[in-house]
Each structure stands twice: as C-alpha cells, then as structure tokens.
Amino acid sequence: MALKIDFNNVFHPYLQKERLGEADIDGYKEKFTSALVSLREKKEKGELGFFHLPYLPEEEIAEIEKTAREVREKFKYFVVLGIGGSALGPLAVHTALNNLRYNELSEELRGGPKFYVEDNIDPERMASLLKVIEPEKTVFNVITKSGATAETLSQLLIVTEVLKKKVGKRFTEHLIFTTDPEKGSLRALARELGVKTFAIPPNVGGRFSELTPVGLLPAAVTGINIRELLAGAREMAERCERENLWENPAGLAAAIHVLLLERGKNMAVMMPYADSLKYMADWYAQLLGESIGKRLNRRGEEVFVGQTPVKALGVTDQHSQVQLYTEGPFDKLLIFLEVERYRNRVVIPPDFPQYAELKFLGGHTLNELIIAEKKATEFALLKARRPNYTVIFPEVNPYTVGELLYFLEAKIAFMGEYLDINAFDQPGVEEGKKATYALLGREGFEEKRQEVLKVKKEPRFILE
C-alpha cells in the first residue's frame, strides 16, 4: 500500500485565521503548472538528475548488490565516512528499515556486518570508533561527491594509516570510494591505488543522493531490499507527475509550505511517531534548510528566504517541545510521520488495577498508546490553531521509505520553483569552507587567512 498524506489540518475551521482555504490552493494552479513544466524541462535536459534515480539501470543495481554480497561475506564491520547527505541518508534509511539495536544483535541475527556512520570529526568520536572495530575486518566506504570534502578526507587519511599498520599493502581491499565519476582528488586517488569505486551522477546534489550508490550500497550491505526502495520511489515519482494540483502530493505540499511561509510560518517541524523514522527528520533538515534557505532569488535579488527545519520525535518531544508548539509563537508548520501498523506488537499487562493510572493502560498495547498519543497531540495542536499535516505509512518498509524520500525531494523542487530560487546549490556553505582551508594553511588561501585573522575578539566579553 502507498503512502497517504493527510492535509486536513491545514484547512480545518478550528485553525480560524491560521488556516488556508481551498481558494488559496486554487489560486496556485497557474504557478503549479508553470513549475511542473519547468521541472520537466530541467529533467529532460539532464539538469536535475534526482528525478531519474528511481529508474536506475539494472546493471548498476546488480553491481551494487554484488559488492554488498561480497562485503557481507568477507567483513565484520562496514563504516561510512561522509558528512551531510553522504551520511544522513544512509543513516536514516538504515535506522528506518533495520532493527533499532542492529549492532547489538548477534552476527547470526544481523546477517551482515556491524554498521557505523561517522559524520563528524570530533577526535573523541574517531578514537572511540577505532576501539570498537577491528580494522582488518572492516570496509570503509568513503563518500564525497566533490572528492574534496576536508572532513571526509581527514577521516580517510586516519583510517588509511591504521589499515596500513594492520594489513600492509592490502589496505586498498578495505576501501570503497563513492564520488564523482571523473573529477576530484578522491577519483584520482582511486585510479592511482586501484580502489573499488561507485559514481555519484554529476547532476545529483549530495542531499538528493540517497537513491544513488551513496545510499543504496550501505542499504544493500545491511540487508535492505534496494529494489523495493527504488520501486517505492517510482510509485511516488508517478504521483508527483500528476497535472492536477490537488492530486499531486509534492506540488500541493510545496504550495502549502510556501503559502504558510508567506504568512509567517518560517519553521517546519518534522515529528515522526516512530523511533525507526527519527533520523528521517535529520535528513530532511538538511534537505529543507540547504535547499530553501537562500539570500538571492534567480534574478539576483536579495530575498533572504527560508523555512527553518526543526527535528522532533513523538512521543518523546511531547514532554519537551510541544508546550512551545501549542502556546508559543504562531510561526510553525508541523509535519507528522504516522505509522498505521508497526512491525512489532507489545501488550501492556493488566496488573495493579487498584491504581487508576495503571488500570486504564492494562490490556492495551504500546501500538495503541503511541497511535492515541499522536492523534491527541494532533488534536491539541489543531485546537491551538497550529497548522499541521501527516504523512501516513501503512507500515515502514523499503517501498514506503522509497516513497517518502522521493516525495520530500520533489516537494523541495516545487518549493524552489514557487519561490524562484535555486534549490540545488548551497553558496552559503562556501565561506566557511574557505575559512577552514585558510586556517589550516592550504595553498592558495593566504589572503583569506589574513582576512579571518583580522577578526579580533574583545577579552571583556569573555567570562572566566
């Protein structure tokens, strides 16, 4: 069964002046048609490669599956070294579709290697990883589209030294590079060393790359059916081609986001009611923030537009964030992820009936409780005039996860068209990169180093 998306709580009368009307959406039909035509043209010209990913050629799928089988047969650990989309996507899909205690399961129950995603350069984190893995039994999947990501390359240098000490000249057998098919230092190094590689299409940005080998190889290594993942994405791709705005999930969701953004809803909270979907909110945070947060529109005019992503988890954050969402500023749109059928059923025993707080729970299940709490939170927010909508999973499986990934990516593409911004670049990230290079003495960044060092801090504003 396919994902359902329930937009009722954007239009409900309870919202009063915070609601959208059907006329608001009808007024977007011309913009939608124009956006759909524009996106189709860019797709046909090969400018937006993520639209093609659900239709990955059979030979590419087979090669990913072959490599995954070899890793599963020969190695005890599989470590992703990457940052941003190179890490968030693999982690989100792994957590969604594998056992939540995956690494703690026995090797027999796992059926594959332990899985780690190292997406930060905190020295304590790297040191702790090296204490729990056996490098000689590990494959490191180094992922960077540009082949020049400083954080990822620093990790590569560290693990390469460790591997050389453990296995000598065979260290290359423990490396897989996922990068640009032609350009970049990582591609050049792979040619020099003879390292196994997978290609990220040049027309696919990092945050849109989960359905490339960036995400498909780690998924296959941990036993996920990547064919079903792609099949779900194809299903959603067809739905997102519909020419009626009211029937196009991505076009309609994007219109809702932009209309509410124009009315002051400058934050978008994603709140899954499933621990398995927790890291989907992390992945989506990059997708929304990096794609839509822009200073300039496509005409070069300053617009400073964006919708700040916020991550929450139901029911955990009912006890930390929901107070703010119900009684704080009217500046948020909430997106719930709901699961109709969880993969496990846990009964709450009917014990200690003399206590009312325990009696009413007995005989129910955790499944019933979490579903009730989601509906209750949804109601409370609606009553407090806070717009929200729900993405409903019949169950969490590779097919529905593939649908979700494509839906969110296509929604972002439509938002970019509606806002007249480039949703596929990230110029605001570049200044920090250049300053990092300068501070570490990279050649060619001497002037930038002087510029950075000119910025002084006043001791009087530093408390000791």
From Swiss-Prot:
Hydrolase keyword on record: no
CDD domains the record matches: SIS_PGI_1, SIS_PGI_2
Entry keywords, A to Z: Cytoplasm, Gluconeogenesis, Glycolysis, Isomerase
A Gene Ontology cellular-component term: cytosol
Positions annotated as active site in the UniProt record: 290, 319, 433
Enzyme class name: isomerase
Compartments (UniProt record): Cytoplasm
Pfam families the record matches: PGI (PF00342)
Pathway assigned in UniProt: Carbohydrate biosynthesis; gluconeogenesis; Carbohydrate degradation; glycolysis; D-glyceraldehyde 3-phosphate and glycerone phosphate from D-glucose: step 2/4
Reactions catalysed, as given in the entry: alpha-D-glucose 6-phosphate = beta-D-fructose 6-phosphate
Biological processes, Gene Ontology terms: gluconeogenesis; glucose 6-phosphate metabolic process; glycolytic process
Functional description taken from the UniProt entry: Catalyzes the reversible isomerization of glucose-6-phosphate to fructose-6-phosphate.
Record family assignment: Belongs to the GPI family.
Name of the protein: Glucose-6-phosphate isomerase
Organism: Carboxydothermus hydrogenoformans (strain ATCC BAA-161 / DSM 6008 / Z-2901)
